[in-house]
């Protein structure tokens, strides 16, 4: 299969980035090192090419009704220029994806833009079109993933860095808000969103002009490796790790994002998730920090101190900020509380660990 390439590929190649296949895209995994890039974002600023994320627009009289049917949050509360995080589930409440839904600023050609994960844009476009046709709704759904580049600038210095290059008042842009404006003279959408826990922005711009925007943001280029360690320190979900409809079927309540489920709205899984909300999930996602040496990895078993299997690791790493091995894991709800003693089986050897609330960092 031919991998999709982001518009900035040539720039990344000239910077000697290392590449990896991620969701069918050939993406930079690191430029200098994961640690250097991670620390730059935590202390100053870093920029990420996130053009592998899907971009799908919904317009027309029934745009809100359609998007509400297929996402768990309440899109009807969004004013123009606002955004919200939510889940996309099947009819049984199993997560297919997580997403940010934007209600675009006034004057935009489309009403809503939502961002599925890498490689999901085709599937989610078809899901929206199928629901539209089945219900006879009046809405236009367009997969615009190839029409935009997406660049994230994240870190304590990100607001000052971007302010110098845009005509948008970033101080007036609150978290989960989006505005239209120019970045380095390039017409763009600027959203105060991110995946790192730091102050930051995500910029959508025409792919032919992405290099101008990238070069104007003079900070450390970062790859997907640092993006992963940064999000893991915050306890953020990753599709394919913390949820997958086949390999890791989870409801939003199990995955720790039950707060995005609005049961007073008309979405496809409302009936199924009402029961989960009433009874509580049998398992929950929890943070884990190893006390012993070792790095927890996806699929490793979690046990009681006596060796009884109770769960498994979904994501794990050595935290560059904490200098400690951390992970996310599914365990029975009774164990999903901080400071419980557990074991993580690392290469056949049980390692002492304790449960942690997330985020691991205070941000």
UniProtKB/Swiss-Prot annotation:
* UniProt protein name: Probable aminomethyltransferase
Which GO BP terms sit in this record? glycine decarboxylation via glycine cleavage system
Protein purpose: The glycine cleavage system catalyzes the degradation of glycine.
Decide whether keyword Phosphoprotein is in the record: no
Family listed: Belongs to the GcvT family.
**Highest taxon above the source species:** Archaea
Give the UniProt keywords, A-Z.
Answer: Aminotransferase, Transferase
Q: Which SUPFAM superfamilies match?
A: Aminomethyltransferase beta-barrel domain, Folate-binding domain
The encoding gene is gcvT
Instruction: Write down the species.
Output: Haloarcula marismortui (strain ATCC 43049 / DSM 3752 / JCM 8966 / VKM B-1809)
Q: Name one Pfam family in it.
A: GCV_T
- Which reactions fall under this protein's catalytic activity? N(6)-[(R)-S(8)-aminomethyldihydrolipoyl]-L-lysyl-[protein] + (6S)-5,6,7,8-tetrahydrofolate = N(6)-[(R)-dihydrolipoyl]-L-lysyl-[protein] + (6R)-5,10-methylene-5,6,7,8-tetrahydrofolate + NH4(+)
Show the InterPro entries listed in the entry: GCS_T, GCS_T_bac, GCST_C, GCV_T_N, GcvT/YgfZ/DmdA, GcvT/YgfZ_C, TrmE/GcvT_dom1
The record's listing under NCBIfam families reads: gcvT (TIGR00528), PRK00389.1 (NF001567)
């Amino acid at each position: 299969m031919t991998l999709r390439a982001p518009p900035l590929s040539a720039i990344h190649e000239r910077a000697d980035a290392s590449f990896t296949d991620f969701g069918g895209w050939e993406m930079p995994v690191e430029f200098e090192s994961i640690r250097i890039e991670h620390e730059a974002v935590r202390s100053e600023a870093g920029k990420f090419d996130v053009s592998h994320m899907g971009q799908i627009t919904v317009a027309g009289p029934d745009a809100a009704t359609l998007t509400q049917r297929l996402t768990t949050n309440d899109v009807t509360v969004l004013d123009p220029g606002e955004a919200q995080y939510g889940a996309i589930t099947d009819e049984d409440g199993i997560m297919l994806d997580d997403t940010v839904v934007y209600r675009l600023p006034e004057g935009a050609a489309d009403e809503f833009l939502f961002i599925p994960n890498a490689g999901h844009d085709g599937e989610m476009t078809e899901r929206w079109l199928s629901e539209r046709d089945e219900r006879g709704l009046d809405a236009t759904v367009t997969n615009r993933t190839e029409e935009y580049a997406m660049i994230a600038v994240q870190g304590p210095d990100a607001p000052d860095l971007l302010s110098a290059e845009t005509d948008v008042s970033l101080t007036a842009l609150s978290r989960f808000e989006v505005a239209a404006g120019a970045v380095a003279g390039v017409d763009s959408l600027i959203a105060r969103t991110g995946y790192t826990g730091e102050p930051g922005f995500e910029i959508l711009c025409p792919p032919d002009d992405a290099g101008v925007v990238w070069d104007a943001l003079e900070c450390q280029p970062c790859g997907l490796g640092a993006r992963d360690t940064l999000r893991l320190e915050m306890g953020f979900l990753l599709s394919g790790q913390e949820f997958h409809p086949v390999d890791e079927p989870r409801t939003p309540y199990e995955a720790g994002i039950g707060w995005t489920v609005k049961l007073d709205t008309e979405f496809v899984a409302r009936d199924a998730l009402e029961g989960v909300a009433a009874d509580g999930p049998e398992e929950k996602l929890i943070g884990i920090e190893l006390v012993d040496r070792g790095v927890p990895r996806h699929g490793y078993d979690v046990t009681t101190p006596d060796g009884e299997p109770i769960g498994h690791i979904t994501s794990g790493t050595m935290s560059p900020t904490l200098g400690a091995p951390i992970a996310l894991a599914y365990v029975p709800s009774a164990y999903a509380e901080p400071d419980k003693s557990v074991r993580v089986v690392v290469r056949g050897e049980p390692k002492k660990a304790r449960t942690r609330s997330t985020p691991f960092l205070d941000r």
